[in-house]
Amino acid sequence: MAFGKVTYQNVSIKYGIFVGIAHIIYFLIMRLFGLQDIVELSFLSSIFLIGGICLAIMAFKRAKNGEIDYFQGLAIGATVGVVSSTILALFLVLYLNIFDSSYLANLQASSLFPRSLSILSLFVLTIIYGSIPGFIIAFVAMQWFKRPDHTMAKRI
């Protein structure tokens, strides 16, 4: 990307899509091994969100020659979280409606979700569960990335 054309929105959306796809692949692998009913394992996918946000901030900082505004970093994290969790939420709605409607009952039986969980509330909760952590992860990550001495150059 050219120096002037790189925006935090473009970078955020790109990495948000990657993280969303990673969430879906992880869910499908869990299903393949019969682990999708262990809801607590789904929270391990937060590793993808952490990695995606850090990679997005690094890519943006590299494209801007090492300059990054603190609020741009926060916006990158929040946007990656929203985009990735929206992709996952859309996938879960399709999955529940087309492939396995009994999965919703498994979520309702979990202590992590209310018994009155509907497909719509699952959609909204999935987006919330990805958006808020995205902002918090970016807040923590920006403590490192905002420093002027933090560079992406390889050290010999």
For the regions a protein language model found, what residue spans apply to each?
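Alpha-helical transmembrane segments with an aromatic anchor "belt"
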Residues: K61-V80
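Functional transmembrane-helix hotspots
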Residues: F91-S111
